[in-house]
C-alpha cells in the first residue's frame, strides 16, 4: 500500500498511526486503561510498533512467533513513527541491540526476545490461552474505572460534504482554494451546561464538549488527508460565551468522574492533533463572539 502512495500520504499515515499509539499510552497514564499485546504469530513493522504502545507484551514460545521492525527484506521501518524511541527510551533496550534488531527481517523469537527486552513475558504454547486470560484479568483489576458504569454509545457523525463545504452539527469547514485556506467555524452550545457529571453523561454523544471534540477531530483529519494544498486554517467561533463557560466549569470541577475525564482527554488529543497538523493556524478573533465574552 505505502509503495503506491504519495509522500504526503505516507507522512499523514505515519503521523496518524503514531498519534494513535500516543493516545493508547496517554490512556494508560491518565484514563485507568491498560493495554495488553498478546503476540501469537508475527508482529512486524507497524504491528510491533502498536504492541510497543501497550503496557505489557506477551509472546508465545512456539519457535515461529517473532517481533520485528522490517516487514520484509529490504523494507525498513518508516522514520518518525516512534518505534526506535519506544524500544530504547521506553523499553530500555540497549542501543547496539536496537540497531541490530532494526535490520533483522526475520525478527527475534522466544528467549532472545525476552533477554533483549523486546517483550515482557514469554509463554509456552501449551498454556498460552490461560495465561493471556489471567494476565488480562490481573491488569483489568488495577483500573480505577467503575465496574458497573454504563458506557456511552457513539453514533455516526452528522456529516455532509457539498462542494467546498463540510458541515457537521457543531463544526463547519469552508474551503477557499484560490487563497489556499480553510475556515473552520465552531458553533457554541445552544443549551446551558448540565449541573452534574451524571446529567452530562445522560446526554451521551450529544453532550456539547464530546460532540465538538469528535467533529473537530474528524474535520482536521479530513483537511490533512484530502486537502493537501490548503496551507492555512482559520478558526472562528460563534455563540454565547457565558453558556460556554458553564461547560468549561463542569469539566474543570469534576476531573475525577470517569465520563468527564474521558471528554477532557478527547479534547486534549484533538487539540494536540491540531497543533501537530502541518498547516499555519490562525484564530479570527474579530468574528468570535465566544471569546469576546471572556
Briefly describe each language-model feature range.
Residues 1, 68, 77, 192-196, ...:
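Short acidic/His/Gly/Ser-rich catalytic and metal-binding motifs that mark active-site loops
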Residues 1-8, 22-36, 60-64, 181-184, ...:
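A structural preference for short, pocket-lining loop segments at secondary-structure junctions
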Residues 2-30, 34, 40-56, 61-112:
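Hydrophobic, small-residue-rich alpha-helical packing segments that form membrane-like cores
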Residues 11, 15, 82, 127, ...:
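Conserved active-site and cofactor/substrate-binding residues in soluble primary-metabolism enzymes
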Residues 39-40, 60-63, 123-126, 285-287:
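Short beta->alpha connector loops at strand-helix junctions that form conserved
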Residues 41-43, 239-241, 287:
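Active-site-proximal loop/turn and secondary-structure-junction residues that shape catalytic pockets
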Residues 49-53, 83, 92-204, 208, ...:
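Amphipathic alpha-helical segments at domain termini/boundaries
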Residues 288-293:
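Conserved small/polar residues in nucleotide/adenosyl-binding loops
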Amino acid at each position: 500500500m505505502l509503495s503506491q502512495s504519495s509522500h504526503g500520504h505516507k507522512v499523514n499515515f505515519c503521523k496518524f498511526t503514531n498519534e494513535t499509539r500516543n493516545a493508547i499510552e496517554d490512556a494508560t497514564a491518565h484514563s485507568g486503561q491498560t493495554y495488553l499485546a498478546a503476540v501469537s504469530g508475527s508482529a512486524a513493522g507497524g504491528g510491533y510498533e502498536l504492541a510497543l504502545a501497550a503496557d505489557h507484551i506477551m509472546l508465545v514460545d512456539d519457535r515461529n512467533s517473532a517481533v520485528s521492525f522490517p516487514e520484509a527484506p529490504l523494507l525498513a521501518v518508516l522514520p518518525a513513527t516512534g518505534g526506535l524511541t519506544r524500544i530504547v527510551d521506553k523499553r530500555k533496550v540497549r542501543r547496539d541491540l536496537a540497531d541490530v534488531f532494526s535490520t533483522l527481517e526475520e525478527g527475534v523469537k522466544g528467549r532472545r526476545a525476552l533477554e533483549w527486552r523486546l517483550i515482557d513475558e514469554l509463554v509456552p504454547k501449551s498454556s498460552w490461552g490461560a495465561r493471556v486470560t489471567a494476565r488480562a484479568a490481573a491488569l483489568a483489576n488495577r483500573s480505577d474505572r467503575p465496574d458497573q458504569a454504563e458506557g456511552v454509545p457513539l453514533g455516526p457523525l452528522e456529516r455532509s460534504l457539498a462542494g467546498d463545504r463540510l458541515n457537521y452539527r457543531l463544526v463547519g469547514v469552508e474551503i477557499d482554494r484560490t487563497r489556499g485556506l480553510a475556515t473552520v467555524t465552531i458553533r457554541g452550545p445552544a443549551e446551558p451546561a448540565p449541573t452534574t457529571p451524571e446529567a452530562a453523561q445522560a446526554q451521551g454523544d450529544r453532550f456539547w464538549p464530546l460532540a465538538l471534540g469528535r467533529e473537530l477531530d474528524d474535520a482536521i483529519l479530513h483537511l490533512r488527508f484530502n486537502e493537501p494544498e490548503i496551507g492555512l486554517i482559520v478558526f472562528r467561533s460563534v455563540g454565547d460565551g457565558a453558556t460556554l463557560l458553564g461547560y468549561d466549569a463542569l469539566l474543570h470541577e469534576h476531573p475525577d468522574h470517569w465520563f468527564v475525564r474521558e471528554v477532557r482527554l478527547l479534547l486534549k488529543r484533538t487539540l494536540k492533533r491540531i497543533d501537530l497538523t502541518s498547516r499555519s493556524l490562525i484564530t479570527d478573533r474579530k468574528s468570535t463572539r465566544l471569546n469576546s465574552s471572556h
